[in-house]
């Protein structure tokens, strides 16, 4: 308010001065008025107000131009942790969704898989460079919650527990969890609760299996958690657990790579895969969701899924 008053006073000085130049009869009054106003508005104050108003106006114009440019892309106004980048947290031991590449990986990321290619396509639409940070599954969820990563894609399925700390996108794939056992084992879907089960720590497989029998689980005493699916499967091979609950796509990869393992008939549970951002980051959630839906509508997501998962 003070700045506005000073600016008006400064403009009054100019007006009075111009009037004084155009009329001799008012020159005396104009001189007195100009002197009085000038005593209130020093050159320094006038300069400061003019400078600040110009700066604010320029900033406002710049902001409006930036917003307009972003909105033109159809993704709204959003920010990421590092300007120009989309940082994705994942656990790259979950084939075919994410795995470490032997070479440069997809688009030079060092990684490959369904989630890697989908995230790369999303980043392209948002005009960002994709950076992938590999870590344990639990750590990937925490990284997003602590703003160390923008988004998590890691064969991540929705759960009410996760929804309390993360904001999810729409689902882009269906995940079916199955049970891996040794060939000739007496383990069945019906007697799983009597066996020792291996799971990947932090996954819905672990959450559901370790829940109480009243809630459909087997209890924590019947579940061993491992940092990743590969370690859980190795525990099965070594006889440390009787079965492993894991998603169907990686289960097939692990069974193919380990002789003597098989998948029990039937599905243990079916769920949807999503991406997720930190709770409350609605702008980024909407931007990613919009890009993701465009990729589903134009068939890109299905092409990526078909590339890695062959229908039987």
Enumerate the language-model features and the residues they cover.
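Extracytoplasmic small-molecule ligand-binding "clamshell" domains
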Residues: 71-155
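Ligand-binding clefts/hinges and TM-proximal coupling segments of bilobed small-molecule sensing domains
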Residues: 71-79, 83, 204-224, 256-265, ...
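Bilobed "Venus flytrap"/periplasmic-binding protein-like clamshell domains
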Residues: 88, 94-95, 109-124, 156, ...
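Periplasmic-binding protein-like
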Residues: 92, 173-181, 248, 252-293, ...
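Short helix-initiation/N-cap motifs at beta->coil->alpha
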Residues: 114-116, 131-144, 184, 223-238, ...
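Extended ligand-binding regions for polar small-molecule ligands
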Residues: 116-125, 185, 191-204, 275-312
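Acidic, polar ligand-binding/catalytic clefts
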Residues: 120, 129-192, 262, 267
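A ligand-binding cleft/hinge motif common to bilobed small-molecule-binding domains
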Residues: 139, 156-164, 208-211, 235-270
């Amino acid at each position: 308010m003070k700045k506005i008053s000073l600016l008006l006073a400064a403009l009054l000085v100019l007006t009075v001065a111009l009037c004084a130049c155009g009329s001799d009869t008012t020159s005396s009054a104009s001189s007195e008025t100009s002197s009085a106003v000038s005593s209130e508005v020093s050159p320094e104050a006038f300069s400061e107000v003019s400078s600040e108003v110009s700066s604010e106006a320029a900033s406002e114009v710049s902001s409006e131009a930036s917003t307009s440019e972003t909105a033109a892309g159809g993704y709204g106004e959003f920010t990421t942790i590092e300007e120009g980048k989309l940082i994705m947290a994942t656990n790259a031991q979950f084939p075919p969704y994410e795995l470490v590449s032997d070479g440069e990986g997809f688009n030079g990321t060092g990684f490959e898989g369904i989630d890697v290619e989908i995230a790369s396509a999303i980043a392209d639409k948002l005009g960002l460079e994709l950076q992938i940070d590999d870590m344990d599954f639990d750590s990937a969820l925490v990284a997003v919650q602590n703003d160390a990563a923008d988004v998590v894609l890691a064969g991540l399925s929705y759960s009410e527990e996760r929804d309390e700390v993360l904001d999810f996108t729409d689902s882009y794939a269906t995940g079916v969890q199955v049970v891996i056992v040794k060939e000739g084992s007496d383990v069945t879907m019906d007697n799983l609760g009597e066996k020792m089960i291996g799971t990947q720590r932090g996954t819905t497989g672990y959450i559901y299996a370790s829940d109480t029998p009243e809630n459909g689980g087997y209890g924590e005493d019947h579940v061993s958690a491992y940092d990743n699916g590969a370690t859980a499967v190795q525990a099965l091979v070594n006889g440390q657990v009787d079965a492993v609950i894991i998603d169907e796509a990686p289960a097939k990869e692990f069974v193919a790579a380990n002789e003597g393992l098989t998948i029990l008939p039937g599905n243990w549970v079916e769920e949807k895969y999503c991406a997720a951002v930190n709770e409350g980051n609605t702008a980024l959630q909407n931007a990613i969701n919009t890009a993701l839906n465009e990729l589903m509508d134009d068939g890109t997501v299905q092409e990526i899924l078909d590339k890695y998962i062959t229908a039987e």
